[in-house]
Amino acid sequence: MAVVLPLGTIATLTPATGSAIVLNCISITGTTRSVAMADITALSDYMLKKLPSRVDPGTVTFEVYLEDTATATNTLKTLRDWQATVTGSSIGYNSVTLSINFPGSTIDALISYQGYISGITEPTVGASDEALRFSVTLQVTAV
């Protein structure tokens, strides 16, 4: 379930190298951590035996406004570039840190996730009175 954030909530995306992007955040759909179980059952065992093995930190999806500025298309392009950077015959991936700052909070980066951009939805443009929105999905690698 998405959490609707108060007006003025800022999402800052900071790449491992380069400049950060600041976006007005609308909502965040949080991550669900899960643990895969390894089967350690021997052939002679009559009951399955399993142990926790690897932790999957999950994904975080956040929805933001497409700003009505000259840099709006640059923001989408930068996010796409961060998703997968192709240089010649090699593909590089950019780790990003998502930090959420709530209005009125004296704590910077109250919520922070680190990971890789795994999906970007394009804004739906049509005849409506709503602001343009798009969402970004981050595969979390560290919390």
Task: Tell me what each language-model feature is.
Residues 73-114:
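Short, acidic/charged, Gly/Pro-enriched secondary-structure junctions
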Residues 130-143:
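Short solvent-exposed strand/turn elements
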